UniProtKB/Swiss-Prot annotation:
It is found in: Cytoplasm. Catalyzes the last two sequential reactions in the de novo biosynthetic pathway for UDP-N-acetylglucosamine (UDP-GlcNAc). The C-terminal domain catalyzes the transfer of acetyl group from acetyl coenzyme A to glucosamine-1-phosphate (GlcN-1-P) to produce N-acetylglucosamine-1-phosphate (GlcNAc-1-P), which is converted into UDP-GlcNAc by the transfer of uridine 5-monophosphate (from uridine 5-triphosphate), a reaction catalyzed by the N-terminal domain. This is Bifunctional protein GlmU. Pfam families: Hexapep, NTP_transf_3. InterPro entries: Bifunctional_GlmU (IPR005882), GlmU-like (IPR050065), GlmU_C_LbH (IPR038009), Hexapep (IPR001451), Hexapep_transf_CS (IPR018357), MobA-like_NTP_Trfase (IPR025877), Nucleotide-diphossugar_trans (IPR029044), Trimer_LpxA-like_sf (IPR011004). It comes from Salmonella schwarzengrund (strain CVM19633).
């Protein structure tokens, strides 16, 4: 069916006392992203013309964190219930648009479920998302008459008979803007909590002869809210299990799906293998036949075909061409670039550095602010000394250079093509093509040398 224009209200004013945190509840992260951001993203994908965020506690931190110019910030200075929260947003509703109500602490709600709810909303009525629970204790019950939804009764206000009802309200609903404003104006706080319940609009709509269509989500977990860290951790595992399942079904070999975390977006080729305890953050692309070893962290990086990243390596904001090998225990920091066939071994760190085709830095090396040519060998313990305490300087190494172990390259410095730098050398001046450079203190031998003896 053809949908009307739609705006979304996200309720995010709660303090989250049971989180025992100074951070507003909705800013606690799931899969590396604030819970409320998951909800905002779902609203955006659904095509919301406007997203109204109702906030209260921690408003400044919310604004600093979300930084979304498209959000309409609505202050709820006092938390007097969900109906009261919606009343604060009501002046922004257009009469001819639908209003979808969501919650900042219900992060797993899917676009697909919301679209079905939107499609099911009757003309002039309400679309209501409900679920059936074996133990509905604490939740508002859906009352029906001859199969039709007639209202919602909060648990504290329910009779013993009503508490036997298993169908409960998730709090997510959609209604026309003009209708919603009219119903909101009629809410009272005559209940056990002394609050204004948005759920009371269901009975108001029913008594006007309006239809209420109940829709169930694809998965109950979509409507699970978070009140404490235990609940958040459970939703994290549910989310990660879903992501792992999608990747397995799309051809990625996860050696242990229960020990894999996706905290962003992963694009991948064919025959990718990922071992246990790998974390993917931000936007990551893995080419064909890429292998990621156990315990690696890959963030905002592009990994080319046939690359292999050995265990416990960290790759952040880096770009690897085809057939590169990394680690184990390597660290590629922002700006690291490896051309085809390059190798970075154990305990090597790169930042703002390019390693040319077929070049190798095998062990215990720091390469920062460096441009390294093709077929270069970087010996163990080599350091580009790029920082003088105030400014960074660049090291340039040409093709086919051999850098011996324990070399210090004091930038700014350029090493020409084919040059050889002997082990233990400190390079402070430019080196010409094909030169041999060495700087060593003369070796001294003292026969019969005795070590000092500790004084008694």
């Amino acid at each position: 069916m053809l949908n009307s224009a739609m705006s979304v209200v996200i309720l995010a004013a709660g303090k989250g006392t049971r989180m025992y945190s100074d951070i507003p509840k909705v800013l606690h992260t799931l899969a590396g992203k604030p819970m409320v951001q998951h909800v905002i993203d779902a609203a955006t994908k659904l095509g919301a013309a406007q997203v109204h965020l109702v906030y209260g506690h921690g408003g400044e931190l919310l604004k600093q964190t979300l930084k979304d110019d498209k959000l309409n910030w609505v202050l709820q200075a006092e938390q007097l219930g969900t109906g009261h929260a919606m009343q604060q947003a009501a002046p922004f509703f257009s009469d001819d648009e639908d209003i979808l109500m969501l919650y900042g602490d219900v992060p797993l709600i899917s676009v697909e479920t919301l679209q079905r709810l939107r499609d099911a909303k009757p003309q002039g009525g309400i679309g209501l998302l409900t679920v059936k629970l074996d133990d509905p204790s604490g939740y508002g019950r859906i009352t029906r008459e001859n199969g039709k939804v007639t209202g919602i009764v909060e648990h504290k206000d329910a009779t013993d008979e009503q508490r036997q009802i298993q169908e409960i309200n998730t709090g997510i609903l959609i209604a026309n803007g003009a209708d919603l404003k009219r119903w909101l104006s009629k809410l009272t706080n005559n209940n056990a909590q002394g609050e204004y319940y948005i759920t009371d609009i269901i009975a108001l709509a029913y008594h006007e002869g309006r239809e209420i269509a109940a829709v169930h989500p694809a998965r109950i977990s979509e409507t699970d809210g978070v009140n404490n860290r235990l609940q958040l951790s459970r939703l994290e595992r549910i989310y990660q299990a879903e992501q792992a399942e999608k990747l397995l079904l799309s051809g990625v070999m996860l050696r242990d799906p229960a020990r894999f975390d996706l905290r962003g977006n992963l694009a991948h080729g064919r025959d990718v293998e990922i071992d246990a305890n790998v974390i993917i953050e931000g936007n990551v692309t893995l080419g064909h036949r890429v292998k990621i070893g156990a315990g690696c962290i890959i963030k905002n990086s592009v990994i080319g075909d046939d690359c292999e990243i050995s265990p416990y390596s960290v790759v952040e904001d880096a770009h690897l061409e085809a057939a590169c090998t990394i680690g184990p225990f390597a660290r590629l920091r922002p700006g690291a670039e490896l051309l085809a066939g390059a190798h970075v071994g154990n305990f090597v760190e790169m930042k703002k550095a390019r390693l040319g085709k077929g070049s190798k830095a095998g062990h215990l090396t720091y390469l920062g602010d460096a441009e390294i040519g093709d077929n270069v060998n970087i010996g163990a313990g080599t350091i580009t000394c790029n920082y003088d305490g105030a400014n960074k300087f660049k090291t340039v190494i040409g093709d086919d250079v051999f850098v011996g172990s324990d070399t210090q390259l004091v930038a700014p410095v350029t090493v020409g093509k084919g040059a050889t730098i002997a082990a233990g050398t400190t390079v402070t001046r430019n080196v010409a093509d094909n030169e041999l450079v060495l700087s060593r203190v003369p070796q001294v031998h003292k026969q019969g040398w005795q070590r000092p003896v500790k004084k008694k």
